[in-house]
Amino acid sequence: AEEEVTEESAPAVTMDDSNCAAPENYCVGLVTDLGKVDDKSFNQAAFEGAQIAAGEIGAFLKYVESTDPKDYTANIGQFVAKEYDTIVTVGFLMAEASAAAAAENPNINFVGVDQFQGETLPNLTGLIFAEDQAGYAAGYLAGLMTKTNKVGAVLGTDTVPPVLYFGEGYRNGVMAANPEAEVTVVYHEPANAFTDPEWGAAEAKKQVTQGADIVFGAGGGTGNGALIEIAKSPESGTSVFCIGVDIDQYNT
């Protein structure tokens, strides 16, 4: 009979951050600028990407959810103190804190999501995206689909460049597809711009009441509020539609 060959299992590795400095360990930390990692939008997309990458290389992954911009440096510092190998900071608002931490810790790799790097640092990679093009595609679709020639968008604050790019791209896409369409784009005030689903829902409802049959929602929990308001409408999927952002929000 053919001999069965089995491989000896490798010694179990403790998956925690008690010894990130050891060569055999790899630790990844993630810090959000606002909101939670299960926000069904921007943060979740980043966190799921980090989970996949950590799983592929056998790394330990831990996250911190920021609730106040004043905490950015301290939250990053939690991972620096334990000598994490890579720290991912999520959101435009963390750009300054990320660059400062990277400059002070040249042996740690930093990844800044939605962060343009004005100064090149060898250990800091800024991930930026063509939000205007994505917004344009969403707007073009809305312009083609609308039956009322009225479409809307409910967004986070326009003081955050990626959000503004989404909005302007959306507006231009609508007009390219349907020059007769009326486009209403509203932005939340800077305070709580991404964590106000009630405002998002109210604005989406207002736009539909005014005749919009397509609403684009982008801006964390605020945009989600708009999408949920449209999704729960009796006309949803037949005469009223919404367009999500960042991840496949049909599923989330």
Positions of PLM-derived features:
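A residue-level marker of the well-folded mature domains of exported/periplasmic proteins
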Residues: 1-252
